[in-house]
């Protein structure tokens, strides 16, 4: 007869032999709990549906009270997990999930389900449910117990847990920013104040004393502690760095009003220090720097644009950084690239403390020109465990700085150069970085898209210089809103360059479309990985890059010249295999909505088809055509909305996709000079969110001059036009604010269309296909 006590004993014995249990680091309870909070949460957790219920085991970590483990056991492996996981009384997984659903209201819960009576034939499942969520996910290897330390580490480094904690940190950054604003701390000093508190909190004497000191005494103690901690560093600029913190002693509120400075330090310890301890080598200060400057009146004057942490980590993987890498960032900022590089190198060092010391003292080199940011960088590196003695204050173009860096023989360059610098173009910073690297080393940099698109002028000369001396290995087009949190409207590309090896003739550079990193914007908390997509996306990107895979709609290899556009959008093919009737139906519905709003009649029964014949979309038999071979392209004539006379007769079509481009309705009589003839396709040529889209205008209209143009063809009617709009919209990913749909880019854009027996566009098929879809009778 099955005996559940046998199953329980396997786990009990395992825990009683665990180091955490022996060292008294946990509270181990069976089928009950003395913890008031846990007991209250389980008061209605009976598997029978009423009253209290307890799992077989509950484990609490004394130093991590927000995390608990619950364990549920069944003797027979056939009762391990039900299909729908809703038979709580009979199945191990189901029961564990029930308890977790109650406990996760206040705790992060690791639930372990165990079944079986034979030690070598146990079934073991692990799931993690985070506090305040109703979702859980599988974690750890199935059918194996792990040491409690591994369970704790796995929980602390779980991607979803990190995202949750990071969101809490960002929320706190907003609260802290508001508090510092109230306390009249200037935006440019806020990050320094936080970094100073974090440095001082490393000192045991300061930690023990700061809560009991008067404001003036505390300000003095804070500055002195920072000085004592940083003076160990062999850096000739250390006195300048310490001087940066002197504002704390003279600040009217911080140094005089009771508890203000103390409360800031206390909250920094609780919210930021704990995060840094858990997630080592993450540029936490950089995130606060971004937040503090987000609402500043003059953020560009105050500082720089910081690369998001998931991208700094991506750079390290692109560059294959390991324990022997020597990394230089000549535009260091707050040190995000160096911190990510240090993390990768230390992981690769595998616990070798001597090697770790060498990494921090000799293999991390940074250069920063701005004084306040240099101070912040040094502090940031201290917080993350040294690595600060090789930070150089100055310009990366100074000969003295160049010679100093070369002594270290760097073999990896990582940088995000200043955008729009008055003295030097972005590619100049990259060429400068390349001169510092050993031959065959890699430089990975992120630059405005305009730098890689240049066909004329100084930037073209820089592109020529780059190919004459180095190899352009890869270029990746990055998400349009990557720097949204920094309030910077710039479309960027990442370039990968092999140093000091001339670009070989006929060598194919790899181009990748890396526009979707899985991050989304929220008004209250900015751009983040809310849906935990980034890990898989990054894995796919890196695999494709390392294997140089050419994937339709994602990547392509191309032999390039300096005057070419160095971006995937110029060369990648559109993936027509994803085209379905839904794409066409949406265009039809959008056009009908536009007709209603622009005062046009919509007849027939809503949703009806004009014919019931079924047509297939066999895109393999279609042929490519240039846009200029299909359309006669003309400019639109509209002016700004301020000069137009409003009315109800004629639509003003702007650079937008929604509502068929409709911006406003105008009077026809008083705007004659701006009117374009209807029955045409309108190409939206500019605009961060709409460049590359098209609309169909059945009647005369006013188009936004300079941002739209129109295409005419005698075969065009409203049915085949909507077919064409659907096809043309597939080209949208190739265009953006940084790469407009103008000139030859528009004329030479290739689209794939059905053809007739003479290999010409099959206008009749396009018309008939639209007529076979719902709502076609309402057109």
Features from the language model and the residues they span:
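Nucleic-acid nuclease catalytic cores
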Residues: 83-134
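Conserved S-adenosyl-L-methionine
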Residues: 302-420, 427-428, 435, 448-449
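Non-catalytic DNA-recognition/assembly elements of restriction-modification systems
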Residues: 554-638, 643-660, 757-779
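Long recognition/docking surfaces used for binding and targeting
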Residues: 195-296
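A short glycine-rich beta-alpha junction/loop motif
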Residues: 495, 702-709, 738-759
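A conserved structural/catalytic subdomain of Rossmann-like adenosyl-cofactor enzymes
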Residues: 62, 77-79, 84-87, 100, ...
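A short beta-sheet element
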Residues: 664-726
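Active-site metal-binding core of divalent-cation-utilizing nuclease and nuclease-like domains
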Residues: 25-67
């Amino acid at each position: 007869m099955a005996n559940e006590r046998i199953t329980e004993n396997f786990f009990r014995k395992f825990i009683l032999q665990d180091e955490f249990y022996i060292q008294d680091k946990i509270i181990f309870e069976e089928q009950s709990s003395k913890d008031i909070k846990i007991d209250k949460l389980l008061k209605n957790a009976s598997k029978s549906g009423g009253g209290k219920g307890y799992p077989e085991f509950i484990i609490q970590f004394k130093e991590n009270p927000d995390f608990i483990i619950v364990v549920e056991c069944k003797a027979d492996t056939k009762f391990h997990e039900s299909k729908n996981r809703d038979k709580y009384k009979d199945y191990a997984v189901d029961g564990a999930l029930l308890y977790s659903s109650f406990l996760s209201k206040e705790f992060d819960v690791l639930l372990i389900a165990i079944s079986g009576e034979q030690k070598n034939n146990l079934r073991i499942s692990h799931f993690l449910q985070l506090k305040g969520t109703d979702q859980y996910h599988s974690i750890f290897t199935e059918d194996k117990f792990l040491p409690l330390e591994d369970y704790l580490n796995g929980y602390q480094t779980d991607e979803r847990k990190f995202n949750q904690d990071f969101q809490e940190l960002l929320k706190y950054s907003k609260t802290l920013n508001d508090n510092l604003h109230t306390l009249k701390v200037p935006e440019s000093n806020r990050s320094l104040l936080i970094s100073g508190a974090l440095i001082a909190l490393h000192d045991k004497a300061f930690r023990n004393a700061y809560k009991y000191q008067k404001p003036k005494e505390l300000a003095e103690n804070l500055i002195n502690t920072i000085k004592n901690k940083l003076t160990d560093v062999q850096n000739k600029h250390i006195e300048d760095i310490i001087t940066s913190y002197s504002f704390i002693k003279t600040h009217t509120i911080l140094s005089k009003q009771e508890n203000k400075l103390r409360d800031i330090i206390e909250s920094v310890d609780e919210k930021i220090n704990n995060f840094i301890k858990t997630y080592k080598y993450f540029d936490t200060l950089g995130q606060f720097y971004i937040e503090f400057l987000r609402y500043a009146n003059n953020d560009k004057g105050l500082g720089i644009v910081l690369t998001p942490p998931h991208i700094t980590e991506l750079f390290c993987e692109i560059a294959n950084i390991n324990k022997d890498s020597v990394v230089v960032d000549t535009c260091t900022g707050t040190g995000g690239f160096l911190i990510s590089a240090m993390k990768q190198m230390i992981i690769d060092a595998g616990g070798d403390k001597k090697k770790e010391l060498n990494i921090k003292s000799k293999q991390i080199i940074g250069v920063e020109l701005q004084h306040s940011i240099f101070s912040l960088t040094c502090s940031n590196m201290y917080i993350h465990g040294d690595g600060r003695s090789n930070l150089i204050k100055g310009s990366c173009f100074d000969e003295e700085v160049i010679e100093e860096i070369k002594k270290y023989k760097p073999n990896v360059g990582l940088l995000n150069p200043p955008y729009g610098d008055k003295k030097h173009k972005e590619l100049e910073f990259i060429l400068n970085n390349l001169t510092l690297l050993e031959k065959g080393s890699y430089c990975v940099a992120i630059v405005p898209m305009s730098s890689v698109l240049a066909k004329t002028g100084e930037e073209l000369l820089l592109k020529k210089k780059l190919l004459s001396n180095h190899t352009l290995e890869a270029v990746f087009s990055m998400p349009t809103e990557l720097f949204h949190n920094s309030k910077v409207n710039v479309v960027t590309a990442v370039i990968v360059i092999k140093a000091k090896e001339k670009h070989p003739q006929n060598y194919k550079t790899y181009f990748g479309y890396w526009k979707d990193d899985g991050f989304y914007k929220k008004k209250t908390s900015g751009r983040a990985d809310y849906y935990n997509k980034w890990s898989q996306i990054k894995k796919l990107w890196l695999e494709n890059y390392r294997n140089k895979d050419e994937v339709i709609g994602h990547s392509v290899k191309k032999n390039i010249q300096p005057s070419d556009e160095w971006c995937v959008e110029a060369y990648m093919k559109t993936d027509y295999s994803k085209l379905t009737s839904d794409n066409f139906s949406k265009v039809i519905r959008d056009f009908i909505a536009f007709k209603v709003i622009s005062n046009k009649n919509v007849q027939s029964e809503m949703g009806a088809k004009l014919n019931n014949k079924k047509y297939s979309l066999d895109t393999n038999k279609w042929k490519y055509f240039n846009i200029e071979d299909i359309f006669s392209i003309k400019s639109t004539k509209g002016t700004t909305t301020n000069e137009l006379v409003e009315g109800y007769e004629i639509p003003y079509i702007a650079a937008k996709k929604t509502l068929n481009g409709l911006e406003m309705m105008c009077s026809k009589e008083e705007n004659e000079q701006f009117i374009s003839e209807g029955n045409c396709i309108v190409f939206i040529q500019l605009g961060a969110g709409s460049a590359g889209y098209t609309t169909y205008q059945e009647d005369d209209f006013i188009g936004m001059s300079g941002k739209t143009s129109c295409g005419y063809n005698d075969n065009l009617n409203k049915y085949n036009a909507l077919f064409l709009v659907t096809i043309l919209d597939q080209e949208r990913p190739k265009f953006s604010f940084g790469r407009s749909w103008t000139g030859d880019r528009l004329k030479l854009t290739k689209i794939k269309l059905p053809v007739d027996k003479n290999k010409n566009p099959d206008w009749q098929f396009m018309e008939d296909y639209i007529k076979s879809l719902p709502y076609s009778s309402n057109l």
